[in-house]
């Protein structure tokens, strides 16, 4: 009987080893490491061309790390409308600025002058843009329902005078209405989009011939904003409905916050964003409120009403250390909020925004805040610590840009707008 059990265990272990070897070979092959893949396949007697989904090994490792880290997270009550697997992934803490300290006026930093170049055009208004987490790609979405994907190194080559460079590497067509927002999967070559057709669509940009989505989530409302959880297993959707929708990427299930107030909430959501670890997420709403949610329980843990007077909040993003939130509103102000206390710690003034749903963003080091001045059609920059305005540059768009997006890893950003153009900004030589 014991020998039978040992044999069964040996067979099970052998099967796991074969699966692991197949995943390793497929991973190496998909990343163009053909010689290494061939050597491993030969040494382990694994078929070189075994069929395994791309990035399957990465996905399994990510799930394993998430499960390991979940042991340190507090549990979720059974009354909460979330699967037990949902939680945050711990990432290394990023060196950050303590914005709660008052910095003297006159001690502001100077941002290097930037220049921009037009890359491409949509057939109509360009409504949104997003960089990949590694800064290697960015995508734009238009009112013409198309999505364009650019490779940043090729953009730089083109700007440097390389006439052979072709930075536009993919164009996707699969929505029936204008695109509202975009996001990249944190670990896979997947780009998602949301649109006025109530859909969230998934595109695999590793496939050169793919023009259509391989997965579609159908919401009940216009999906105005989306954000991937850092694990890639869940995504947030902000819609015309006042309550954020949370989707399980694998099961298509939609979950709602368990304690969302029934009264005092009336506006659509303009933007949703996760923090860097997924431990908290935020909504910026047309009713003028900023709302913070626990990333594990999905409970609303703080609501800042009238954050921008009686004006709608157009954007809200976290600092990398998750201690502060930067918001923009149609009252022409940009504000920095301390999450723990809910108090405003900085206010950035001097740029008019009353018509467009413009964002305020940090640069990659969080030393500067960048936004748009509709009245002067300029890109405006403030020192993030002192709140001094330190630079303003003509946008070079015909009409004020409606979207601005900064690379997470270097000093480059993208603007796009009603003139249909996409402009790439970098430091002047």
Swiss-Prot record:
Region spans: Hydrophobic: 20-41
Membrane spanning stretches: none
Gene3D superfamilies: YVTN repeat-like/Quinoprotein amine dehydrogenase
Source superkingdom: Eukaryota
Subcellular location: Nucleus
Pfam families: WD40 (PF00400)
Keyword Nucleus: yes
Residue ranges of WD repeats: 121-160, 174-213, 218-257, 264-303, 308-347, 351-392, 396-429
GO CC annotation terms, alphabetical: mRNA cleavage stimulating factor complex
CDD domains to which the protein is assigned, alphabetical: WD40
Major site of localization recorded for this protein: nucleus
GO biological process: mRNA 3'-end processing
Keyword Phosphoprotein in record: no
PROSITE patterns linked to this entry: WD_REPEATS_1, WD_REPEATS_2, WD_REPEATS_REGION
Alphabetical UniProt keywords: mRNA processing, Nucleus, Repeat, WD repeat
InterPro entries linked: CstF1-like (IPR044633), WD40/YVTN_repeat-like_dom_sf (IPR015943), WD40_repeat_CS (IPR019775), WD40_repeat_dom_sf (IPR036322), WD40_rpt (IPR001680)
Quaternary assembly: Homodimer. Belongs to the CSTF complex. Forms a complex with cleavage and polyadenylation specificity factor (CPSF) subunits CSTF64, PABN3, CPSF30, FIPS5 and CPSF100.
PANTHER family documented for this protein: CLEAVAGE STIMULATION FACTOR SUBUNIT 1
Functional summary from the UniProt entry: One of the multiple factors required for polyadenylation and 3'-end cleavage of pre-mRNAs. May be responsible for the interaction of CSTF with other factors to form a stable complex on the pre-mRNA.
Domain notes per entry: N-terminus mediates homodimerization.
Protein known as: Cleavage stimulation factor subunit 50
Species this chain originates from: Arabidopsis thaliana
Chain's gene name: CSTF50
